């Protein structure tokens, strides 16, 4: 079970890094917000889901 939590945290860190880099680049690029809005919202939803799933799985570990 511990390896699952470690894997989830690793995925969360990688995904967070991608969002931290990708979202400001999207905002800084002219016209990209309209094209990438759905992708950013989807990414934020996936990130939120990862946080909740990681917390839920972690609650089963002593």
Swiss-Prot record:
Subunit structure: PSII is composed of 1 copy each of membrane proteins PsbA, PsbB, PsbC, PsbD, PsbE, PsbF, PsbH, PsbI, PsbJ, PsbK, PsbL, PsbM, PsbT, sbX, PsbY, PsbZ, Psb30/Ycf12, at least 3 peripheral proteins of the oxygen-evolving complex and a large number of cofactors. It forms dimeric complexes.
GO cellular component: chloroplast thylakoid membrane; photosystem II reaction center
Keyword entries, A-Z: Chloroplast, Membrane, Photosynthesis, Photosystem II, Plastid, Reaction center, Thylakoid, Transmembrane, Transmembrane helix
Transmembrane parts of this sequence: 8-28, 41-61
Underlying gene: psbZ
GO biological process: photosynthesis; photosystem II stabilization
Family stated for the protein in its record: Belongs to the PsbZ family.
InterPro entries xref list: PSII_PsbZ, PSII_PsbZ_sf
Subcellular locations according to the entry: Plastid, Chloroplast thylakoid membrane
Role of this protein: May control the interaction of photosystem II (PSII) cores with the light-harvesting antenna, regulates electron flow through the 2 photosystem reaction centers. PSII is a light-driven water plastoquinone oxidoreductase, using light energy to abstract electrons from H(2)O, generating a proton gradient subsequently used for ATP formation.
Membrane topology summary: Multi-pass membrane protein
Protein transport as UniProt keyword: no
Stored PANTHER family: PHOTOSYSTEM II REACTION CENTER PROTEIN Z
Keyword Transmembrane helix: yes
NCBIfam families: PS_II_psbZ
Name listed for the protein in its UniProt record: Photosystem II reaction center protein Z
Gene3D superfamilies linked to this entry: Photosystem II PsbZ, reaction centre (1.10.287.740)
């Amino acid at each position: 079970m511990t390896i699952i939590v470690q894997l989830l945290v690793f995925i969360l860190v990688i995904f967070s890094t991608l969002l931290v880099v990708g979202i400001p680049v999207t905002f800084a690029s002219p016209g990209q917000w309209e094209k990438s809005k759905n992708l950013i919202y989807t990414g934020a939803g996936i990130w939120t889901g990862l946080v909740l799933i990681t917390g839920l799985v972690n609650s089963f570990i002593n």
